[in-house]
Amino acid sequence: MSNQCKTIAHVLPVNNGQEIHVWETPPKENAPSKNSTILIASGFARRMDHFAGLAEYLSENGFHVFRYDSLHHVGLSSGSIDEFTMTTGKNSLCTVYHWLQTKGTQNIGLIAASLSARVAYEVISDLELSFLITAVGVVNLRDTLEKALGFDYLSLPINELPNDLDFEGHKLGSEVFVRDCFEHHWDTLDSTLDKVANTSVPLIAFTANNDDWVKQEEVYDMLAHIRSGHCKLYSLLGSSHDLGENLVVLRNFYQSVTKAAIAMDGGSLEIDVDFIEPDFEQLTIATVNERRLKAEIESRAPEMA
């Protein structure tokens, strides 16, 4: 088995000299061909290299896969997380999507986890997606933030907010984040329902039965508001909101999302499909190679590290 890194790195220049880093994983040779190209939007405080395993699963099954790090987030792209907002996440996703279109990429299927799923729901009616798959996707941002942070900071006047909100060891700039939530209506369940109601994009949502941050009944509510009915909910049994908490949960996530992508590429919402599973050595090699690639890119631009 080759130890050569198959990941292809791209850099997209954006406004004010900023850059979005994108990684490309081509489909494996001799893999069954697919109609769709996959774009992966990582969850909050997760970098694109955290999804190396999922990219390998999808590539092994014939998908061309792209991932990116959002602006003002963890990872390789420009900016610091204390300036991150949901609108920044939206703009980063749309920039990468439109870049793929300029490359002639058609039939883009989007996979989004956690907070990035809320971004995906925001734009689902604006982008021409083949399908959307979400995992532990946030539908009620205010409620999820209260669960994650231990307090409903969105209830405070702006001038009473702390300087930072500590989210999994990362410092969110509270004022810029909260102002954006209110100004662009990111905060409520109803705002999510309004965005998805008229979409015709097929959607599979994965919840986790031990997720303390996202209420499964609210995900059901969201799907019930999609008038097309082209949607289905599945549960990742034994998982919490942290899809990487152990290898069993992580493997189930990889398998389930890969099967969903195969099914939806074929026009179905039923994920009882055959798939090819990469072996552990292959996943390990891909992960190690991407860590080296990340370190190499950071060494060329220390200010991004």
UniProtKB/Swiss-Prot annotation:
GO MF annotations, alphabetized: acyltransferase activity, transferring groups other than amino-acyl groups
InterPro entries: AB_hydrolase_fold, LuxD
Enzyme Commission identifier(s): 2.3.1.-
GO biological process, one term: fatty acid metabolic process
Alphabetized Pfam families for the sequence: Acyl_transf_2 (PF02273)
Pathway of action: Lipid metabolism; fatty acid reduction for biolumincescence
Alphabetical keyword list: Acyltransferase, Luminescence, Transferase
Active site feature: S114 (charge relay system), D211 (charge relay system), H241 (charge relay system)
Role noted for this protein: Acyl transferase is part of the fatty acid reductase system required for aldehyde biosynthesis; it produces fatty acids for the luminescent reaction.
UniProt record similarity statement: Belongs to the LuxD family.
Protein's name in the database: Acyl transferase
Species this protein is from: Vibrio campbellii (strain ATCC BAA-1116)
Gene that specifies this protein: luxD
